[in-house]
């Protein structure tokens, strides 16, 4: 195997680059439709268009305080949402990983562009943004 690689180094490098490009293209097609938002950029999006905000936290956490007009939907129930592919949907939770998982599910369901709030509800609170519900 090593002899083949050394004797065909140009072929090996070309094949390696081709594999990298294919993997990169596939990753971009999956993740390219998911964008992170800062609290400030979320405010701009909310002011500019109709947005569905999905709070992935437990109902107790949601009731204690959530972003105004957010809907409390669990990660398991994301697939039950009726969406149009042009909808603007932003997911958030306690951390990014759950919000990213939800955004990936939405893209798989046909949504062209999904967003998630970077840093979750904690970044929203740290930036002194308004909450709805009991605090």
Segments predicted by a language model, with ranges:
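Rhodanese-like catalytic fold shared by cysteine-dependent sulfurtransferases
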Residues: 1-40, 48-51, 59-88, 94-135
């Amino acid at each position: 195997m090593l002899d083949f690689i050394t004797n065909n180094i140009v072929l090996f490098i070309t094949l390696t680059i081709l594999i990298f490009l294919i993997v990169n293209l596939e990753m971009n097609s999956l993740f390219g439709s998911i964008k992170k938002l800062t609290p400030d950029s979320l405010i701009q999006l909310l002011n500019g268009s109709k947005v569905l905000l999905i709070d992935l936290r437990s109902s107790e956490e949601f009731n204690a305080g959530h972003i105004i007009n957010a809907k409390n939907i669990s990660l398991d129930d994301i697939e039950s949402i009726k969406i149009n592919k042009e909808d603007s949907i932003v997911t958030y939770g306690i951390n990014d990983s759950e919000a990213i998982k939800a955004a990936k599910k939405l893209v798989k369901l046909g949504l062209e562009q999904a967003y998630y709030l970077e840093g979750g509800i904690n970044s929203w609170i740290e930036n002194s943004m308004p909450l709805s519900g009991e605090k």
